[in-house]
Amino acid sequence: MSSDESDAASNKEEDTTLSDDDGSDVEIKNSKKDRKRKLASESEKSGSDDDDDDDDDEDENVTSKKSKKQKRKNKAPSGRDFLAWDVEVDDEDEDDDNDYDDEDDPSMNAMNEREEAERAMKEMELSQRNRDRYKFQNMTEDEVQKYFENKYKGDKNDSQYDDEDSAMDDISKNSHLPSTKDPNLWIVKCRMGEEKLVAMHLMRKCLAVEHTNEPFQIKSVVVKEGLKGMIYIEAFKQSHVMSAIEGFSALNQFTITMVPIKDMVDVLRVVKDIPQLKLGSYVRLKRTMYKDDLAVVDLVDIAQNRVNLKLIPRVDYQKRRGAMRTDADKNYKLKRRPMPKLFDQDTIKEVGGEIVTDGDFLVFEGNHFRRGFLYKYFPINAIQADGVKPTLGELEKFQESSDDLKRELETASLKDTENPFVPGDIVEVKAGELVNLRGKVMTVDGTKVVMMPDQEDLKEAITLNAHELRKYFKEGDHAKVISGRYEGHTGLIVRVKDSTAIVLSDLGMEELKVRVRDLQLCADVTTGVDSLGQFQYHDLVQLDHTGNVGVIVRLEKEHLEVLNMHGVVNRIKPQAIIAKKDVRFAKVLDSQNNSIEAKDLVKVIGGPNAKERETDEDPVGEVLYAFRGTVFVYSRKVTKNGGVLVCKPKQLILQGAKKTTSTPMVSRMASPNPMASPRHSSGGMTPRSPQDGMSSRGSSGGQTPRQGGGGGRGGHFGTANQQKVRRDLTLIGKNVRIIKGPMKGHFGIVRDATEDTVRVELHTQCRTISVDRARVMVVGDTGITAGSGGGSSFYSSSKTPMRDSGKTPMYGSKTPMYGAQTPMYGSMTPAYDGGRTPAYGEGGRTPAYGSKTPAYGDLDEHSSSRTPAYGNDSSRTPAYGSADGARTPAYGSTEGGRTPAYGSMDNSRTPAYDDSGRTPGYESMPSRTPNYDSSSKTPAYPESEHSARTPAYNNDYDIPLSPAYEPDAPEAYDNAPARTPAFVSRTPGYDTYENSSPTYEPDAATKVEEDIGDTSSPTYDSPPHSYVVPTPGAMLNPATPGAYHVDTPGFAAPMTPGSGGAYDQYVAPSPFAGYDSNNYNNADGAIEQIPDHFLAQGVWIVQNLCVQIKDHEGRFNGREAIIKDVTDGKVDVYMPDHKCNLEVDFDQLTPMKPQPGDDARVIFGQDAGHSGQLVSMDGFEAVIRSQEDMSDMRVINIGLCCKMHSET
């Protein structure tokens, strides 16, 4: 029977069945059974035919037949498998039915199967349409209802089978549960941290004895992750466990506990920790670039184990993208995390970034942004949801308005933390009918709070929910922070607004912004000790192994803030601190060489911590520590960094110490004023007077200049050797009383003393303080203080002899006094006769007797007045005879022992010169200093006698000479070195003539003798060497000698300005002939400069200021930048030239000078903060007109202004 005939028969049978009158489901099932029987008969016939065909192949190999069967089983199912009416027949001929395919070709099999499946599907669709068409024609409504009920109601047999399957599953699971026949679990105590190590040792020991006569009887060892101090051992008996752990010191053999059978399953059960995330809750990231950043949960997808977070993006705005990308940008690697900042699409477009829009979102580099925030999916295990407490600063960044922040603070859930209320708290009702009702908490029971109202009409306690209350504080309350970042701090509440409070800390005197619920009324003051009790407030700690130290300025719950030696605050954990430092006995010298140490009171006079305006007071504080040239000072008036200042010793001055008036001996090269005269070792006091307030002890005034004092061999150049502080042993050990200052009235014993300061150990206090010597008096003395220097001087002969009215000082010829006016007619210094300074005459010269330095004369002169005094014997200083070379400087008449040594005709002079180049020189004697060639005389002069003496003089004019000159002086005077002071310049000089041009005439020196009123002034050639000493003070109107401690010329090897070194920028020649444009001030001479320390602090930096970049990458240095934002000590600027953003530090910015028409802002001075438009400039003065008030126009120094970026 063919397949077409069978199909037609089946269709005919189907039509016949559907046309029956009963139309019941039973007949439909019978028709299906008949159809299945026919198909089965057809398959038997085809099977019999196949059997006949297979008789010829009976001799084939059995192995080949089995392999074919296996291949048939592995083939894809045929189309017949998809037919619902196909039934299985008996299994007798199952092996034969598998060989229905003609060939084993896979392609042929697939093609045949596809054709059969398509034909079968067409037949099913046709039959289904026919059944749906005629199914309900002859059925009543009840029959149709019954049909659908039977079709869709549940099958009881199916549910029965499901119950049986579940029961089998339960039985199979229960079979794995431990029973009494299984080994037990035993708990063994273990040393903390060695659980895994012990398990490994047990395994090795078990393997070692496995094949011996006594193997271990334990089955397994279990170590649970996170469970410290115990392990589990599986064994039948406790004795088996004890024998296995014998010899392990890390295990406790005497405490072995068995786990109950019912609890054994829970021991090894692994519970997946899924955080309970809620929409809008705050979380933190554990890893990625956003580690420790705060985020808000936006969507939770538990199925895919991820969560969508809203957070502040970290986008690198400096990286060029797209078409603007260069070869250098291709190798660009992000070295640091970008700053968190809201997404700025304009900046991204400027660097070449491409942004697309997806609804409300902006898509950039695969990330979605909305309203500046980043929305991104993260794995759930990458976030931390427990214990997240955002700070107020972080909450402000996430809130789009102040109302959102207020709402966030007010609706902060109390369920996440413990009940913040305790009995005794003052609370206020924030919601409900009793809003704003205040009272006192009586008891707390879970989330219920019993409050006693403070109203007179309400005398009964009220029970309220905790979330309906909030703590109430008023200004002036003393509170303690019980949670949060500032936990443990105490302070005074200075302001309360909504749910936040401003607390003034007791330790650092700084304002803390905390939430009200984190506060609690407290009468105690914090001890300033951290939670571990290891460090204390204001402790000096070592930060690293390089010697960097710092002072603790803030204590937090888990961190410390340390102010290091460089003035930078580091926030570190206590574990990062190496050790505490003990430098209580360290001492340093302040700017006046006073010794300061811990607990001394000092004043800050320089550096970044000095006063910013002249009207302000200098900061005063107590020395906390002195360490390696760094002093930590605590000032109560400073709130920054807890009042701790980092200063250098030279920026401080000891309070109560007398300022030293003497100028330390420095060389010309180190002089702060290049026009000053060369300095003497005695600071210009030659000889030194006892009325200068200083002891002559240790003084070099009036002594013979030391060997090498001119910078030659043995010279000191003003080093510490000459400034050494000497101790006064006469006062040590005496009882003194403080008569002045803050410690007035205290008694003590002197432990150490110098010329200016004494160290007094107080009797009433266990401390030693430094006191000015003038403020203490020895007990038992009658009103005599322990003045500077204490006892007598070393030498009485070092002072200027005082024996008549012509001496200085003395009445009659004192300076100033009548007849000694300065200036007076003729520019005399002082007036003629006995008022000259220093006066000359008998014994009145400076130094006395012949005005020689060192003074000497003939053998019959008074030897006691010489400085130093000497006679004709070896007591001279240094002693010398008339012909030996021991003079100071030693020289003979013709030898080269002079200083500088030279011969009479050679070029070894300093500097070398010929006979006509002495300065100031006359005649042809070979001992003038300094000297150089004739073309550069200072001042120039002819070789006539008395023509170029310094100062110039003539017997015909009553012009005083300094030092005094006598025509009949010994010849040694005329042969002495060059005289001082200068040529023609009277002291103090004034000229009645108006013309003072610094021109030079060759016979200028001669004209002085002929006409003292000559107005010509000499000019000078540049010295041939930088160490040539010029004639001091020419045309500079020098002051009265001695008033400014004028040193002996030539001493300490003065350096000619302009020859390099420290004063290379001062190009004025010497002698000075007028100001040059490149001198001390700028060209305009009046532009005010902003201190560098003020610029480095960054307090002047505001948005839209135009600045210049320095100390950065080469392509950015010197470029203009516009300030966009200031965050966490960093400045975010925009570079118009590079069209990119840049992050810099405060000290990398300098303000730009505005031009007329620019917007400007005053950043320093009394008008700081004033802004407007720069209307005009007149030199250094700028006229700035305020944009708010057009009538407000101010004239401000241009050096105090900075250009502002204009939006228009």
UniProtKB/Swiss-Prot annotation:
Positions of the KOW domain: 420-447, 473-506, 595-629, 730-763
GO biological process: regulation of DNA-templated transcription elongation; regulation of transcription by RNA polymerase II; transcription elongation by RNA polymerase II; transcription elongation-coupled chromatin remodeling
UniProt modification remark: Phosphorylated. Phosphorylation by P-TEFb alleviates transcriptional pausing.
UniProt feature, compositional bias: Low complexity: 695-706
CDD domains to which the protein is assigned, alphabetical: KOW_Spt5_1, KOW_Spt5_2, KOW_Spt5_3, KOW_Spt5_4, KOW_Spt5_5, KOW_Spt5_6, NGN_Euk
Domain of life: Eukaryota
Region Interaction with SPT4: start-end pairs: 182-274
Composition bias type Basic and acidic residues, residue spans: 39-48
Pfam families, sorted: CTD, KOW, KOW1_SPT5, KOW2_Spt5, KOW4_SPT5, KOW5_SPT5, KOW6_SPT5, KOW7_SPT5
Sequence positions bearing Phosphothreonine: T815, T822
InterPro entries noted in UniProt: KOW (IPR005824), KOW_Spt5_1 (IPR041973), KOW_Spt5_2 (IPR041975), KOW_Spt5_3 (IPR041976), KOW_Spt5_4 (IPR041977), KOW_Spt5_5 (IPR041978), KOW_Spt5_6 (IPR041980), NGN-domain (IPR005100)
Compositionally biased intervals (Gly residues): 707-717
Gene Ontology cellular component annotations, sorted alphabetically: DSIF complex; euchromatin
GO molecular function: mRNA binding
Keyword Cell membrane among record annotations: no
Annotated region described as Disordered, given as residue ranges: 1-116, 151-176, 658-726, 792-812, 836-1004
Basic residues composition bias: residue spans: 65-75
Annotated region described as Interaction with RNA polymerase II, given as residue ranges: 317-421
Quaternary structure and partners: Interacts with spt-4 to form DSIF. DSIF interacts with RNA polymerase II and with the positive transcription elongation factor b complex (P-TEFb complex), which is composed of cdk-9 and cyclin-T (cit-1.1 or cit-1.2).
Protein name: Transcription elongation factor SPT5
Source organism per UniProt: Caenorhabditis elegans
Gene name of the encoded protein: spt-5
